């Protein structure tokens, strides 16, 4: 079956001042020819004068064939199909918003395209109809093309009744819900940071323990923090959460508390690795490190009684 195609949004053309995602197809004397990815790959052009605010010394440093770019629409002739675009007029903030909108809209597109394939649709018109009866309904309802459908689909993971008002057959509804759940069900991520905490004063060991406990107190019920000793003075902090941004924030907050507490005792605090989402490979390597250190420490008398500190619910 040939691949089905459809634009992301109900309107067939972008409006002037819209920031859109394009893919560069070719570069000519006049400028760069691009495909508007959100509008079923209709053609547009970035004039050379709209590539950069600075003098152009090398076009290839500004734009390359095959690369995606965020550009702003400066002219649309719907009758002739001409779309003029500018790269130099897009601010960094606008580019970030464009990337976010494109990512979410592409997710909705992927879900509906897969629904169409599962249901053996063979014509682009059938996919277009599916968009009209689902994604574009929510885009229009919330007046947010791209975001409306994504937010509605995401909420449908926990509340499928959101889809009740849509004009769908039983098969369409069933397959749509299955695909929404498969693509948008939140996945837990593990976030890790590596720190060094030390205090060489008379009560140095107690000062370190006190600082780490203060960091652990930043744990929440949904985001428990763990702190493991790698090798003095280095520790690894981890938390597992469904909310990536909040998880990063909680670890940063805990690190700030540890830093403040240990420095009150004239101790030392250094960040060896900023909080980041870690992969299974990272975790496997960390587990090997901890296992190796555990074996080494088992041979040493007088080990500290805790290589791992976990958040506790004690008052």
UniProtKB/Swiss-Prot annotation:
Q: What is its main location?
A: cytoplasm
Purpose of the protein: Member of the eIF2 complex that functions in the early steps of protein synthesis by forming a ternary complex with GTP and initiator tRNA. This complex binds to a 40S ribosomal subunit, followed by mRNA binding to form a 43S pre-initiation complex. Junction of the 60S ribosomal subunit to form the 80S initiation complex is preceded by hydrolysis of the GTP bound to eIF2 and release of an eIF2-GDP binary complex. In order for eIF2 to recycle and catalyze another round of initiation, the GDP bound to eIF2 must exchange with GTP by way of a reaction catalyzed by eIF2B.
**Has keyword Cytoplasm?**
yes
Any one annotated GO CC term: cytosol
Q: Which organism is it from?
A: Xenopus laevis (African clawed frog)
Tell me what PTMs the record reports for this protein: Phosphorylation at Ser-49 and Ser-52 stabilizes the eIF-2/GDP/eIF2B complex and prevents GDP/GTP exchange reaction, thus impairing the recycling of eIF-2 between successive rounds of initiation and leading to global inhibition of translation, while concomitantly initiating the preferential translation of integrated stress response (ISR)-specific mRNAs.
Ranges annotated as biased composition (Acidic residues): 299-308
Stretch list, region Disordered: 292-315
Q: Which GO terms describe its molecular function?
A: ribosome binding; RNA binding; translation initiation factor activity
Protein name, entry field: Eukaryotic translation initiation factor 2 subunit 1
Gene3D superfamilies on file: EIF_2_alpha, Nucleic acid-binding proteins, Translation initiation factor 2, subunit 1, domain 2
Q: Which residues form the S1 motif domain?
A: 17-88
């Amino acid at each position: 079956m040939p691949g089905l195609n459809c634009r992301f949004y109900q309107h067939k053309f972008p409006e002037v001042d819209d920031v859109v995602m394009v893919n560069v197809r070719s570069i000519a004397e006049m400028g760069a020819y691009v495909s508007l990815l959100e509008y079923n790959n209709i053609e547009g052009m970035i004039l050379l004068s709209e590539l950069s605010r600075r003098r152009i010394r090398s076009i290839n440093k500004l734009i390359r064939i095959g690369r995606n770019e965020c550009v702003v629409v400066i002219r649309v002739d719907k009758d002739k199909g001409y779309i003029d675009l500018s790269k130099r007029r897009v601010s960094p903030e606008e580019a970030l918003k464009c990337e976010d909108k494109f990512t979410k809209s592409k997710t909705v597109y992927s879900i509906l395209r897969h629904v169409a394939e599962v249901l053996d649709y063979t014509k682009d018109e059938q996919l277009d109809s599916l968009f009209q009866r689902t994604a574009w309904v929510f885009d229009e309802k919330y007046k947010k093309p791209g975001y409306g459908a994504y937010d509605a689909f995401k909420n449908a993971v926990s509340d499928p009744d959101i889809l009740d008002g849509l004009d769908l057959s039983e098969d369409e509804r069933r397959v749509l819900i299955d695909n929404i759940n498969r693509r948008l069900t939140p996945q837990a991520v593990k976030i890790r940071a590596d720190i060094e905490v030390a205090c060489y004063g008379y009560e140095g060991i107690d000062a370190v323990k006190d600082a780490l406990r203060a960091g652990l107190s930043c744990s929440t019920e949904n985001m428990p923090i763990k702190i493991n000793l790698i090798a003095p003075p280095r520790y690894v902090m981890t938390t597992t959460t469904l909310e990536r941004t909040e998880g990063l924030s909680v670890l940063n907050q805990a690190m700030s508390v540890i830093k403040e507490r240990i420095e009150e005792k004239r101790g030392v605090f250094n960040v060896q690795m900023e909080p980041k989402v870690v992969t299974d490979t990272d975790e496997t390597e960390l587990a090997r490190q901890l296992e190796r250190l555990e074996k080494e420490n088992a041979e040493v008398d007088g080990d500290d009684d805790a290589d791992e500190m976990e958040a506790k619910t004690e008052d």
